[in-house]
């Protein structure tokens, strides 16, 4: 495998991560003198502020996911590659990825965030985070399965346990999920 990116005399800007920051930078470089390579582990940009809507069945995942190749389909000197980055060699101006090594002139790391459990192992092991489309779908599936089980459950304690939902964290995503209509409404 490899990147299969044509040689050019232009300086190459490699952007790791296609979230808001990476996407905005790629857009700003639209009419620049650079060759731009965007690398992301997903082939789509997701809109995180609406993940709670996917988790609560208000939206489908494709309503908040936008393929990079479609976003940049008419761009010259722009290349998207689906890959995971494993390492950076600043002295050699290269990155190591799941599809090979790539040279760069300028490197921008805009890889996003991960869920921070603040060292709480119980929450880490027992919770369903919601930072990605996949996690929002997993949360939605769990909520719907629990609601279906509760519908046929005859044991009041078991039914209550199935209907209990604990939101950990008071950020925007947790608050929006907590206040959004449930799938049974």
Question: For each predicted feature, which ranges?
Answer:
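FAD-binding core/adjacent interface of flavoenzyme oxidoreductases
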Residues: 1-12, 79-166
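N-terminal Rossmann-like dinucleotide/flavin-binding domain of flavoprotein oxidoreductases
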Residues: 3, 28-104
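N-terminal Rossmann-like FAD-binding beta1-loop-alpha1 element of flavoenzymes
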Residues: 13-32, 177
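Cofactor-binding loop segments of dinucleotide-utilizing enzymes, especially the Rossmann-like FAD-
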Residues: 18, 40-41, 170
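Conserved Rossmann-like nucleotide-cofactor binding loop
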Residues: 21, 44, 114, 173
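Short glycine-/acidic-enriched loop or helix-start segments at secondary-structure transitions
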Residues: 25-26, 48, 118-120, 177-178
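Conserved small/polar residues in nucleotide/adenosyl-binding loops
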Residues: 179-185
